[in-house]
């Protein structure tokens, strides 16, 4: 018998179609170098994805529009953090130039 069993996996997702999509997407992520959420018994990324689904570490987002909004918010926060860092660097450069001008 294969582990994890299909019955156990179907308790974690709404349908077998959702299971296949989730497994495929997670396997692609793992192949692309995504950080695993646990230690695996399997070597293949497809079986590793099933292990993560079985353990509940990987789930389907219940509301796709909420997920998109969360991704947008994360990107916006990263952009704002980058702008703040650039502003601080510019202030530091201006301060150093000002101090250099006073010494001359």
Swiss-Prot record:
The record's listing under PANTHER family reads: DNA-DIRECTED RNA POLYMERASE SUBUNIT OMEGA
Q: How does it assemble?
A: The RNAP catalytic core consists of 2 alpha, 1 beta, 1 beta' and 1 omega subunit. When a sigma factor is associated with the core the holoenzyme is formed, which can initiate transcription.
Record's protein name: DNA-directed RNA polymerase subunit omega
**Record HAMAP family:** RNApol_bact_RpoZ
Q: Give the family per the record.
A: Belongs to the RNA polymerase subunit omega family.
Q: Which organism is it from?
A: Streptococcus pyogenes serotype M1
GO MF terms listed in the record are: DNA binding; DNA-directed RNA polymerase activity
InterPro entries with a match to the protein in the record: DNA-dir_RNA_pol_omega, Pol_omega/Rpo6/RPB6, RPB6/omega-like_sf
Q: Name one GO cellular component term.
A: DNA-directed RNA polymerase complex
Q: Which reaction does it catalyse?
A: RNA(n) + a ribonucleoside 5'-triphosphate = RNA(n+1) + diphosphate
EC number(s) reported in the record: 2.7.7.6
Alphabetically ordered keywords of this record: DNA-directed RNA polymerase, Nucleotidyltransferase, Transcription, Transferase
Q: What class of enzyme is it?
A: transferase
Q: What does this protein do?
A: Promotes RNA polymerase assembly. Latches the N- and C-terminal regions of the beta' subunit thereby facilitating its interaction with the beta and alpha subunits.
